[in-house]
């Protein structure tokens, strides 16, 4: 029996993203292990692991077309991992860049929000896309609570990449919410959802650059 991808465009884009994240994991962890403390390798390990989990879950969901029950569970996992990756992206910023009471409180807040998001998706994975986008974008911008400390702690270039990633993620979330039906009608395997995937990949790339080039080198 020939295997056929359920959503080829979505499966391929995030399959590529998973491979890129896996390739980037080793150099990131090697660089973070140069410090004598364990905070660098733990925080950056959480960052890259949660990124890989998101892309693995997304690739699996968009690749496999099984029973309605299995598909629903895979969809829940896919959506839940978005909250997990957002929290994972915050972790190095909170524990390394800030490394103070503000950072610890923000880290606890984003992970608590991630848990609430996971519970929400467990019970209402079919909620309107705009609700999902509001939740993801809102969680992503919790950093405004510590905006000035982050600006002062990161080099200008590092903050620029961090901000660029946040903006790109936000644009992707808006595209996800709008769905762009006219575009979808013209491109069967590469519609608004796949464009959303590309924006998520670009946002991840920006944040990987921040972590590898700036955060991994920061003393605490």
List the predicted regions and their residue ranges.
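Multi-pass alpha-helical transmembrane bundles in non-GPCR membrane proteins
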Residues: 1-220
